[in-house]
Amino acid sequence: MNTTVNILLGELIGTMVLIILGNGVCASVNYKNMFAKQVGANWLLIALGWGFAVFCGVVISIQVLKGNANLNPAVTVYFMINQKGANIGLLFAMIAMQLLGAMIAQIILNSLNWKHIIENDAEMLKASSCTGPSHRKAWFRNISYEMLGTMILLAGVMAGDYHKLTGVFFVMAIVMSLGSVTGCAINPARDFGPRVIYFLTAKAFNKKLQNPVSADFRYGLVPLLAPIAAGLIMGGFSLLINQ
Protein backbone atom coordinates (compact mmCIF):
# COMPACT_ATOMS: atom_id res chain seq x y z
CA MET A 1 0.00 0.00 0.00
CA ASN A 2 1.31 3.46 -0.83
CA THR A 3 1.95 6.23 1.67
CA THR A 4 -1.15 8.25 0.80
CA VAL A 5 -3.43 5.26 1.32
CA ASN A 6 -1.68 4.46 4.61
CA ILE A 7 -2.13 8.02 5.83
CA LEU A 8 -5.81 8.18 4.91
CA LEU A 9 -6.56 4.69 6.23
CA GLY A 10 -4.72 5.59 9.43
CA GLU A 11 -6.92 8.64 9.95
CA LEU A 12 -10.10 6.66 9.20
CA ILE A 13 -9.44 3.63 11.39
CA GLY A 14 -7.64 5.60 14.10
CA THR A 15 -10.65 7.89 14.48
CA MET A 16 -12.99 4.91 14.47
CA VAL A 17 -11.09 3.30 17.35
CA LEU A 18 -10.98 6.64 19.19
CA ILE A 19 -14.77 6.99 19.06
CA ILE A 20 -15.52 3.31 19.68
CA LEU A 21 -13.47 3.33 22.88
CA GLY A 22 -14.28 6.89 23.94
CA ASN A 23 -18.03 6.77 23.46
CA GLY A 24 -17.96 3.09 24.36
CA VAL A 25 -16.91 3.89 27.91
CA CYS A 26 -19.65 6.53 28.07
CA ALA A 27 -22.20 3.90 27.02
CA SER A 28 -20.81 1.50 29.62
CA VAL A 29 -21.46 3.84 32.53
CA ASN A 30 -24.82 5.15 31.29
CA TYR A 31 -26.86 2.27 29.88
CA LYS A 32 -28.93 0.05 32.14
CA ASN A 33 -27.66 -3.56 32.39
CA MET A 34 -24.13 -2.60 31.38
CA PHE A 35 -21.74 -4.22 33.87
CA ALA A 36 -19.82 -0.98 34.47
CA LYS A 37 -23.10 0.75 35.35
CA GLN A 38 -24.07 -2.08 37.71
CA VAL A 39 -20.81 -2.52 39.63
CA GLY A 40 -19.64 1.09 39.57
CA ALA A 41 -16.06 1.79 40.62
CA ASN A 42 -15.32 -1.93 40.84
CA TRP A 43 -15.33 -2.03 37.04
CA LEU A 44 -12.32 0.30 36.99
CA LEU A 45 -10.55 -2.03 39.43
CA ILE A 46 -11.30 -4.99 37.15
CA ALA A 47 -9.98 -3.14 34.07
CA LEU A 48 -6.81 -2.05 35.85
CA GLY A 49 -6.33 -5.50 37.35
CA TRP A 50 -6.54 -7.21 33.98
CA GLY A 51 -4.18 -4.68 32.43
CA PHE A 52 -1.60 -5.25 35.15
CA ALA A 53 -2.18 -9.02 34.88
CA VAL A 54 -1.18 -8.83 31.21
CA PHE A 55 1.85 -6.73 32.18
CA CYS A 56 3.03 -9.32 34.71
CA GLY A 57 2.39 -12.25 32.37
CA VAL A 58 4.26 -10.58 29.50
CA VAL A 59 7.26 -9.59 31.65
CA ILE A 60 7.61 -13.07 33.15
CA SER A 61 7.19 -14.78 29.77
CA ILE A 62 9.67 -12.55 27.92
CA GLN A 63 12.19 -11.39 30.50
CA VAL A 64 12.32 -14.32 32.91
CA LEU A 65 11.60 -17.31 30.66
CA LYS A 66 12.76 -15.81 27.33
CA GLY A 67 9.44 -16.78 25.72
CA ASN A 68 7.19 -15.06 23.18
CA ALA A 69 4.41 -13.89 25.54
CA ASN A 70 1.45 -14.54 23.25
CA LEU A 71 -0.60 -15.69 26.29
CA ASN A 72 -3.71 -15.75 24.09
CA PRO A 73 -4.76 -18.20 21.33
CA ALA A 74 -6.18 -15.29 19.31
CA VAL A 75 -2.72 -13.70 19.28
CA THR A 76 -1.13 -17.00 18.28
CA VAL A 77 -3.66 -17.49 15.46
CA TYR A 78 -2.88 -13.94 14.30
CA PHE A 79 0.83 -14.81 14.08
CA MET A 80 -0.03 -18.13 12.38
CA ILE A 81 -1.69 -16.19 9.54
CA ASN A 82 0.81 -13.33 9.59
CA GLN A 83 3.72 -15.76 9.25
CA LYS A 84 1.88 -17.78 6.56
CA GLY A 85 1.87 -20.99 8.57
CA ALA A 86 5.56 -21.00 9.51
CA ASN A 87 6.28 -22.97 12.72
CA ILE A 88 2.64 -24.06 12.80
CA GLY A 89 3.41 -27.04 15.05
CA LEU A 90 5.01 -24.80 17.66
CA LEU A 91 2.11 -22.36 17.47
CA PHE A 92 -0.45 -25.11 18.14
CA ALA A 93 1.68 -26.31 21.06
CA MET A 94 1.70 -22.74 22.40
CA ILE A 95 -2.11 -22.66 22.31
CA ALA A 96 -2.21 -25.93 24.25
CA MET A 97 0.14 -24.47 26.88
CA GLN A 98 -1.98 -21.32 27.13
CA LEU A 99 -5.08 -23.39 27.86
CA LEU A 100 -3.21 -25.59 30.34
CA GLY A 101 -1.73 -22.55 32.08
CA ALA A 102 -5.16 -20.97 32.47
CA MET A 103 -6.57 -24.18 33.96
CA ILE A 104 -3.71 -24.67 36.42
CA ALA A 105 -3.96 -21.03 37.48
CA GLN A 106 -7.69 -21.37 38.21
CA ILE A 107 -7.06 -24.53 40.25
CA ILE A 108 -4.50 -22.61 42.32
CA LEU A 109 -6.93 -19.72 42.85
CA ASN A 110 -9.76 -22.05 43.83
CA SER A 111 -7.50 -23.77 46.35
CA LEU A 112 -6.44 -20.47 47.88
CA ASN A 113 -10.01 -19.13 47.98
CA TRP A 114 -11.81 -22.33 48.97
CA LYS A 115 -13.24 -21.04 52.25
CA HIS A 116 -14.61 -17.99 50.43
CA ILE A 117 -15.96 -20.17 47.64
CA ILE A 118 -18.04 -22.40 49.93
CA GLU A 119 -19.50 -19.46 51.87
CA ASN A 120 -20.77 -17.75 48.68
CA ASP A 121 -23.20 -18.84 45.99
CA ALA A 122 -21.50 -20.84 43.25
CA GLU A 123 -22.51 -18.08 40.83
CA MET A 124 -19.72 -15.98 42.39
CA LEU A 125 -17.18 -18.70 41.60
CA LYS A 126 -18.39 -18.91 38.03
CA ALA A 127 -18.37 -15.11 37.63
CA SER A 128 -14.79 -14.92 38.91
CA SER A 129 -13.73 -17.78 36.62
CA CYS A 130 -15.24 -17.10 33.20
CA THR A 131 -17.34 -14.54 31.39
CA GLY A 132 -21.08 -14.23 30.90
CA PRO A 133 -23.11 -11.67 28.93
CA SER A 134 -25.66 -9.15 30.14
CA HIS A 135 -28.13 -10.52 27.56
CA ARG A 136 -27.41 -14.18 26.89
CA LYS A 137 -29.69 -14.60 23.86
CA ALA A 138 -28.23 -11.60 22.00
CA TRP A 139 -25.86 -13.86 20.11
CA PHE A 140 -24.95 -11.50 17.27
CA ARG A 141 -24.26 -8.62 19.64
CA ASN A 142 -22.18 -10.77 22.00
CA ILE A 143 -20.13 -12.23 19.15
CA SER A 144 -19.64 -8.74 17.69
CA TYR A 145 -18.41 -7.30 20.99
CA GLU A 146 -15.92 -10.14 21.49
CA MET A 147 -14.67 -9.91 17.92
CA LEU A 148 -14.35 -6.12 17.97
CA GLY A 149 -12.55 -6.10 21.31
CA THR A 150 -10.13 -8.78 20.15
CA MET A 151 -9.48 -7.02 16.85
CA ILE A 152 -8.55 -3.83 18.69
CA LEU A 153 -6.31 -5.85 21.02
CA LEU A 154 -4.59 -7.41 18.02
CA ALA A 155 -4.07 -3.95 16.54
CA GLY A 156 -2.00 -3.35 19.67
CA VAL A 157 -0.07 -6.54 18.92
CA MET A 158 0.56 -5.25 15.39
CA ALA A 159 2.04 -2.13 16.99
CA GLY A 160 4.38 -4.33 19.03
CA ASP A 161 7.48 -2.74 17.54
CA TYR A 162 6.41 0.54 19.17
CA HIS A 163 6.55 -1.03 22.61
CA LYS A 164 6.24 -4.64 23.74
CA LEU A 165 3.85 -3.66 26.54
CA THR A 166 1.42 -1.66 24.41
CA GLY A 167 -1.14 -4.42 24.94
CA VAL A 168 -1.43 -3.55 28.63
CA PHE A 169 -3.12 -0.25 27.87
CA PHE A 170 -5.17 -1.81 25.07
CA VAL A 171 -6.56 -4.36 27.53
CA MET A 172 -7.48 -1.66 30.06
CA ALA A 173 -9.20 0.46 27.41
CA ILE A 174 -11.07 -2.50 25.90
CA VAL A 175 -12.36 -3.71 29.28
CA MET A 176 -13.47 -0.21 30.29
CA SER A 177 -15.13 0.61 26.97
CA LEU A 178 -16.29 -2.69 25.45
CA GLY A 179 -16.35 -5.15 28.34
CA SER A 180 -19.68 -4.26 29.90
CA VAL A 181 -21.76 -6.45 27.58
CA THR A 182 -19.94 -9.80 27.56
CA GLY A 183 -17.52 -9.47 30.46
CA CYS A 184 -14.74 -9.13 27.89
CA ALA A 185 -12.90 -12.41 27.36
CA ILE A 186 -10.97 -11.40 24.19
CA ASN A 187 -8.85 -14.48 24.95
CA PRO A 188 -10.14 -18.05 24.47
CA ALA A 189 -7.68 -19.50 27.02
CA ARG A 190 -8.68 -16.94 29.65
CA ASP A 191 -12.33 -18.02 29.39
CA PHE A 192 -12.38 -21.67 28.33
CA GLY A 193 -9.69 -22.96 30.70
CA PRO A 194 -11.25 -21.54 33.88
CA ARG A 195 -14.73 -22.47 32.61
CA VAL A 196 -13.65 -26.12 32.41
CA ILE A 197 -12.24 -25.92 35.95
CA TYR A 198 -15.48 -24.38 37.22
CA PHE A 199 -17.41 -27.25 35.59
CA LEU A 200 -15.16 -29.89 37.17
CA THR A 201 -15.26 -28.15 40.56
CA ALA A 202 -19.05 -27.97 40.49
CA LYS A 203 -19.23 -31.68 39.63
CA ALA A 204 -16.66 -32.81 42.20
CA PHE A 205 -17.87 -30.63 45.08
CA ASN A 206 -21.56 -30.34 44.25
CA LYS A 207 -22.64 -30.87 47.87
CA LYS A 208 -20.22 -28.28 49.24
CA LEU A 209 -21.07 -25.49 46.80
CA GLN A 210 -24.10 -23.30 47.39
CA ASN A 211 -26.61 -23.31 44.52
CA PRO A 212 -24.33 -24.63 41.74
CA VAL A 213 -25.04 -23.16 38.30
CA SER A 214 -24.26 -24.41 34.81
CA ALA A 215 -20.86 -23.76 33.26
CA ASP A 216 -22.87 -22.78 30.14
CA PHE A 217 -20.53 -24.22 27.53
CA ARG A 218 -23.03 -23.25 24.84
CA TYR A 219 -22.45 -19.57 25.51
CA GLY A 220 -18.79 -20.42 26.09
CA LEU A 221 -18.48 -20.92 22.33
CA VAL A 222 -18.72 -17.13 21.94
CA PRO A 223 -15.56 -16.19 23.91
CA LEU A 224 -13.88 -19.26 22.43
CA LEU A 225 -14.58 -18.78 18.73
CA ALA A 226 -15.13 -15.02 18.28
CA PRO A 227 -11.55 -14.09 19.33
CA ILE A 228 -10.17 -16.85 17.08
CA ALA A 229 -12.15 -15.38 14.17
CA ALA A 230 -10.70 -11.97 15.04
CA GLY A 231 -7.21 -13.48 14.94
CA LEU A 232 -7.84 -14.84 11.45
CA ILE A 233 -9.22 -11.50 10.24
CA MET A 234 -6.41 -9.40 11.70
CA GLY A 235 -3.78 -11.84 10.46
CA GLY A 236 -5.15 -11.45 6.95
CA PHE A 237 -5.36 -7.67 7.39
CA SER A 238 -1.70 -7.51 8.44
CA LEU A 239 -0.69 -9.31 5.25
CA LEU A 240 -2.82 -6.94 3.17
CA ILE A 241 -1.42 -3.70 4.56
CA ASN A 242 2.18 -4.93 4.40
CA GLN A 243 2.07 -5.90 0.73
From Swiss-Prot:
Record's keyword terms, sorted: Cell membrane, Membrane, Repeat, Transmembrane, Transmembrane helix, Transport
Catalytic activity reads:
glycerol(in) = glycerol(out)
Report membrane topology.
Answer: Multi-pass membrane protein
Q: Which Gene3D superfamilies match?
A: Glycerol uptake facilitator protein
Question: Where do we find the motif NPA 2 here?
Answer: 187-189
InterPro entries, alphabetized:
Aquaporin-like, MIP, MIP/Aquaporin, MIP_CS
Cysteine pairs forming cystine bridges in this chain are: none
Q: Which residues lie in coiled coils?
A: none
Q: What is its main location?
A: membrane
> Mind telling me which residue stretches traverse the membrane in this protein?
7-27, 44-64, 88-108, 143-163, 166-186, 221-241
Does the keyword section mention Transmembrane? yes
Single Gene Ontology MF annotation: glycerol channel activity
Query: Any one cellular component term from GO for this entry?
Result: plasma membrane
Give a Pfam family name: MIP
Compartment annotation? Cell membrane
Name the residue ranges of motif: NPA 1.
Answer: 72-74
- Asked if the keyword Heme belongs to this entry, the reply reads no
Give the protein's biological function: Mediates glycerol diffusion across the cytoplasmic membrane via a pore-type mechanism.
Question: What family classification does the UniProt entry report for this protein?
Answer: Belongs to the MIP/aquaporin (TC 1.A.8) family.
Query: Any notes on this protein's domains?
Result: Aquaporins contain two tandem repeats each containing three membrane-spanning domains and a pore-forming loop with the signature motif Asn-Pro-Ala (NPA).
Q: What is this protein called?
A: Probable glycerol uptake facilitator protein
Q: Which organism is it from?
A: Mycoplasmoides gallisepticum (strain R(low / passage 15 / clone 2)) (Mycoplasma gallisepticum)
Q: Gene that codes for this?
A: glpF
